Amino acid sequence: MKKTRFLFLVCPATSLILELLPWGEVLNFGQPDGEPIRQTYSYFSLTPFGYANFGPLITAVLSCVLLVLSIAAVIRPVQRLWRANGNVAIVAALVSLMPRVMFGARYFTPIGGAITLLLVAHTVLMIVLLKRAEKSADTN
């Protein structure tokens, strides 16, 4: 069980590392020749936020909160922390899809997809851990 709890830190830490990379978010700028200029940014960059692409920055902040909650849940395994962790992970995963929903596939990168998958994997792992904890509490 303890190894599983430490595995619980891998998904938020990896997603945070991917969010720091400068290839996570895309902005397409028009030019007179017709072919758009594609520029990529980090999830923590304020430039996409300034162009009304709010999803990446909100996802990055929620991932930081998720990592802190995960560390707290590993140190002090309380049911409340696990549930809060799951709620934040679900919201972060949904918000990470915002660029694809609002602007289309051209604004979604493979790194953005990996971040979304890591957040979903974290949510699934959290649900599995909660089910195990409930089963062990029922048998005791």
Residue spans for each PLM region:
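Hydrophobic transmembrane helix segments
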Residues: 4-65
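Structural signal for the C-terminal ends of transmembrane alpha-helices
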Residues: 21, 72-78, 128-134
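Hydrophobic cores of alpha-helical transmembrane segments in multi-pass inner/ER membrane proteins
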Residues: 8-14, 63-68, 117-131
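Aromatic-anchored segments of alpha-helical transmembrane domains
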Residues: 14-22, 91-101
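Membrane-interfacial loop-to-transmembrane-helix junctions in polytopic alpha-helical membrane proteins
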Residues: 3, 48-58, 78-81, 104-107, ...
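Membrane-interface extramembranous regions at the lipid-water interface
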Residues: 1-3, 79-88, 134-139
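Loop-to-transmembrane helix junctions at the membrane interface
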Residues: 54-95
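Alpha-helical transmembrane segments of multi-pass integral membrane proteins
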Residues: 95-140
